[in-house]
Each structure stands twice: as structure tokens, then as C-alpha cells.
Amino acid sequence: MPTYNQLVRFERKSKVRKTKSPALEANPFKSGVCLVVKTVTPKKPNSALRKVATVRLSNKRTVNVYIPGEKHSVKEHDRVLVRGGQVPDLPGVKYHVVLGAYDIAGVKGRKQGRSRYGAPRKQVVATKK
């Protein structure tokens, strides 16, 4: 416990929290340009071909981003919107692509969890009685 005089001389320092997505620089989203689209295999107990893209952000940082959902329209030189969020079984992938923004189409035929995959609402046709 510090003395009163010590607190007058040296104020208490608050702990600095380490961010999990440093490339976003405290922003919720950043835009970028896709450099490479590739597939990556996950860590040990899992097996798949996860879709990943390397993106150069607007702040000149290059990051690996995960492309969620089934099928995607991400190509080289596409403009993408990037959000934070790690993929547990892919080391070094700390970001996600936002589907349905800029040049990226949403997942087609998606009925549940549409907002996460940029899928439009199905149009209901009114019938006469």
C-alpha cells in the first residue's frame, strides 16, 4: 500500500489491455484490397480446406482474413471490408471478411443467420384469397 505522499508524487497507472486485432487500430472495420485467395488446412484434430485471403488494408498493413460461408465470390484485387474475429483452428488468422459489402456477394440461398453472411431476405409473394 503506497503512502499518501507517494500517490501525490506518482499517480496510479492503469493496466494497458492488449487488443486481439491490432491491424484494425481500434476501428470496428477496415477496408482493403485482396492480394491472394487460398485454402489452408486447420490445426490437428480438425480436417478441412478453409478459405483464406491475404488483404492489404487501407492503413498499409497486410493481414490474413477468413472467408466464412459456403462458396464465395472473393477474387484477387477485389475491395473487401474486414472485421475482427479469430478463427480458432487457423493460426495467424485474426480477421473475417464481411460478406455482402463492397465487391463481395453474400451467401446465396441462406435462410438462417442471414445477416452474418450478407444474404438477402426472401421475397414473399402475396396470394389472393
From Swiss-Prot:
Belongs to the universal ribosomal protein uS12 family. InterPro entries: NA-bd_OB-fold, Ribosomal_uS12, Ribosomal_uS12_bac. It comes from Rickettsia bellii (strain RML369-C). Coiled coil: none annotated. The modification 3-methylthioaspartic acid is found at residue 89. One of its GO terms (molecular function) is rRNA binding. NCBIfam families: rpsL_bact (TIGR00981). The keyword rRNA-binding applies. GO terms for biological process: translation. The gene is rpsL. Residues 110-129 are annotated as: Disordered. Pfam families: Ribosom_S12_S23. With S4 and S5 plays an important role in translational accuracy. Interacts with and stabilizes bases of the 16S rRNA that are involved in tRNA selection in the A site and with the mRNA backbone. Located at the interface of the 30S and 50S subunits, it traverses the body of the 30S subunit contacting proteins on the other side and probably holding the rRNA structure together. The combined cluster of proteins S8, S12 and S17 appears to hold together the shoulder and platform of the 30S subunit. Keywords: Methylation, Ribonucleoprotein, Ribosomal protein, RNA-binding, rRNA-binding, tRNA-binding. HAMAP family: Ribosomal_uS12_B. This is Small ribosomal subunit protein uS12. CDD domains: Ribosomal_S12. Part of the 30S ribosomal subunit. Contacts proteins S8 and S17. May interact with IF1 in the 30S initiation complex. Transmembrane segments: none annotated. One of its GO terms (cellular component) is small ribosomal subunit. PANTHER family: 30S RIBOSOMAL PROTEIN S12 FAMILY MEMBER (PTHR11652).
